[in-house]
Amino acid sequence: MGGGAEPKSRPSRLAFHHRQCLHETETFVSKDSCLTEYYHPGGLDTAFTDPKWGADQAKLAIDQGADVIFGAGGKTGNGALIETAANKGVYCIGVDTDQWETVPEARPCLISSAMKLITPGVFDLISKAKEGNFPSGNYVGEVGLAPFHDFDAQIPAEVKAKIAEIDKGLRDGSISTGYNP
């Protein structure tokens, strides 16, 4: 689920799709997996503020056999997460922050969240400015994965190890997402 199809929402989708398509080489995603995407048709004034639309799209995806919903798009994505939580046996992944804390209604399905670690980025930029080394242009900060919370015991150690390996590879550049802005 995505709040809008504007360029800043595309990198996550493209990177995820790239990794999913490499399933035959080195990932634990099933070869029979399928990626389905829904983007809000409205402009930026509604794309990120429409939880009903997000819930409706999540229900549509679940009715078509989806077993994991990645609910991005602000309140629109939150609607998708909450709808997913109402469906036993379907999982969800949050975005931007640890949505375990911000969307508690999603906890029954919320495995983790892909987080933008804004606080360390702001700290880094302020520190650079204080030192007189404020960078011009775009700043790319840290990202991370939220804790597994209640799902922690259900995530096998080998999956956690593979996630750590992938995280390391993404950070050191040995794994490419396939996305080049």
Language model: regions and residue ranges:
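A residue-level marker of the well-folded mature domains of exported/periplasmic proteins
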Residues: M1-P181
